[in-house]
Amino acid sequence: MAREFSLEKTRNIGIMAHVDAGKTTTTERILYYTGKIHKIGETHEGASQMDWMEQEQERGITITSAATTAQWKDHRVNIIDTPGHVDFTIEVQRSLRVLDGAVTVLDAQSGVEPQTETVWRQATEYGVPRIVFANKMDKIGADFLYSVSTLHDRLQANAHPIQLPIGAEDDFEGIIDLVTMKAEIYTNDLGTDILIEDIPADYLDQAKEYREKLIEAVAETDEDLMMKYLEGEEITETELKAAIRKATINVEFFPVLAGSAFKNKGVQMMLDAVVDYLPSPLDIPPIKGVNPDTDEEEERPASDDEPFAALAFKIMTDPFVGRLTFFRVYSGILNSGSYVLNTSKGKRERIGRILQMHANSRQEIETVYAGDIAAAVGLKETTTGDSLTDEKAKVILESIEVPEPVIQLMVEPKSKADQDKMGIALQKLAEEDPTFRVETNVETGETVISGMGELHLDVLVDRMKREFKVEANVGAPQVSYRETFRQATQARGFFKRQSGGKGQFGDVWIEFTPNEEGKGFEFENAIVGGVVPREFVPAVEKGLIESMANGVLAGYPIVDVKAKLYDGSYHDVDSSETAFKIAASLALKEAAKTAKPVILEPMMLVTITVPEENLGDVMGHVTARRGRVDGMEAHGNSQIVRAFVPLAEMFGYATVLRSASQGRGTFMMVFDHYEDVPKSVQEEIIKKNAGEA
């Protein structure tokens, strides 16, 4: 089958936002107007097309990023609906990695909210062009220009309206297009009857003022346009559109639109903007990767004629077809039934069937082309972030960075029958979600699961019960502490055992130095002259990694440390890999005496919104929880407090805030960084873990 839509007419976009900004409803409306669904499902009724997991429909939030494809004005638009809750940031990150553009949905009453900042920052890291949709213009307190100001103040974004709303709240009745200088007036509830007319007289001055501001902002990114503007020449609609498109694709400018997805207003104009201003796969730089055979960097331009290269960005277990691997094709074409090479794992995989997904229904297709997003059935070894390529043209594409989990729970099966099922269930859930880890406590034999927050683990335990029919008892949440060294030191690890027969001999000198935060463990072999034979060096590294997993103070993993093996000795007969592994672990123990080890705790960026009269209570809460205030701002009758607070102090805070503010206060928290715990707290943690507390 030939390609249905050219690359120029393909858009891969994500829809991202803070929880409750109306993102899923916006996606629903897109599917409605592009003819993918015939009846609109409301998120708050639990009937939305994109939210297809039972927990999503119950909770009214999007947990997994469903991928769907739609058509608008002879373009194919592949949409990924991403979750807005902070516990599911990996879903957002995975999606951004494979998208070409995004629509950021704001609640027009609140403007930029904490999770908007998080997803915006992630999109900036990946260089994703964005348009902004100020949604919920029908809501009480909706203020379009306030929303635009929060983009400047909180995100320092060069964002400007390309539209203005006509009215707000119950009087929101249309939209002014600042590019065409026409008004769209909505005359029915479904937003299908639209009158295009001249701008109402009482809005004309404002429209002229904001068109001028728009031209000025865009001209700063385009020299030719700037010259015309400075010389007082008329800027045509075509020129302005082209300049907005170019500046948006270069991530120098962010167009802002207005609408109400729930009231069916502004969604079609937003779809027009997706087609007009967001990039096609041809507008973005070719994907880069490394050839595993030569270690040389290679590029894969978006073209069907190039060798096949794709990135797997999500694994999902489907109740009907089993394991689904979602992938983005960067170059080449792929037919069902063919073989590909998973270059990340060095394994050959057969593509069984290829499915084009629509929320949770599917259409089988024979071929996928460059720029497409699809799901494959039959891949056994592939996990999130793996590269799939033509066997004759290998390349490893840049993978997806996975954040470390910050919270853990103990789970135990209720019966022997549940025990076997629980192992399988946890393994499948961990395959789908790289931020979900499953470990067994070596000393107690307990199963410990870790993730990005309480809601994240709640949802996974819930899925274990529903999808895999596993009944389990769940312990109280625990903080995932870490350990690190604060001072450079050198230490010797010497292991010798000779008691008849073959002995054991390993001797190493290792220099340990603190590493930058987030860099993890780095090992360097600086042995000269073979004093530690080359074949034993990997055993030294392995010995360090294994013993660092259990720390030196309270059994938490040691992170952000460099280890340099620089001296040692060996025995011709008695030296072995095991002996050098043990010697390395002894060196680590020895180093702990002088390296000033400390315990690190996850610090959360907490954003608390309360009525003015509760501000004093909140400041007290932050101080009592070892937190520090980072900033405050007034918003209407509310105060917004931003603070860094240790995760350990935040359990149960929702109840405290609810009673202090009579249920009117809300808070959001997102992991920010790790920090040394105070000495007194460190001693308590060590005692508790030693079983003394």
Swiss-Prot record:
Q: Which SMART domains match?
A: EFG_C, EFG_IV
> Entry's InterPro entries?
EFG_II, EFG_III, EFG_III/V, EFG_IV, EFG_V, EFG_V-like, EFTu-like_2, G_TR_CS
Q: Where does GTP bind?
A: 17-24, 81-85, 135-138
Sorted alphabetically, the Gene Ontology BP terms of this entry are: ribosome disassembly
Show where the tr-type G domain sits. Answer: 8-282
Q: What is its main location?
A: cytoplasm
Family matches, as Pfam families: EFG_C, EFG_III, EFG_IV, GTP_EFTU, GTP_EFTU_D2
| Disulphide bridges, residue numbers | none
Q: Which domain of life is it from?
A: Bacteria
List GO molecular-function terms, semicolon-separated. Answer: GTP binding; GTPase activity; translation elongation factor activity
Q: Does the keyword Cytoplasm apply?
A: yes
- Protein keywords: Cytoplasm, Elongation factor, GTP-binding, Nucleotide-binding, Protein biosynthesis
Q: Which GO terms describe its cellular component?
A: cytoplasm
The record, for PROSITE patterns, names:
G_TR_1 (PS00301), G_TR_2 (PS51722)
Location within or outside the cell:
Cytoplasm
Name the family the entry cites.
Belongs to the TRAFAC class translation factor GTPase superfamily. Classic translation factor GTPase family. EF-G/EF-2 subfamily.
Q: So what does this one do? A: Catalyzes the GTP-dependent ribosomal translocation step during translation elongation. During this step, the ribosome changes from the pre-translocational (PRE) to the post-translocational (POST) state as the newly formed A-site-bound peptidyl-tRNA and P-site-bound deacylated tRNA move to the P and E sites, respectively. Catalyzes the coordinated movement of the two tRNA molecules, the mRNA and conformational changes in the ribosome.
Q: What is this protein called?
A: Elongation factor G
Lineage, opening ranks = Bacteria, Bacillati, Bacillota, Bacilli, Lactobacillales
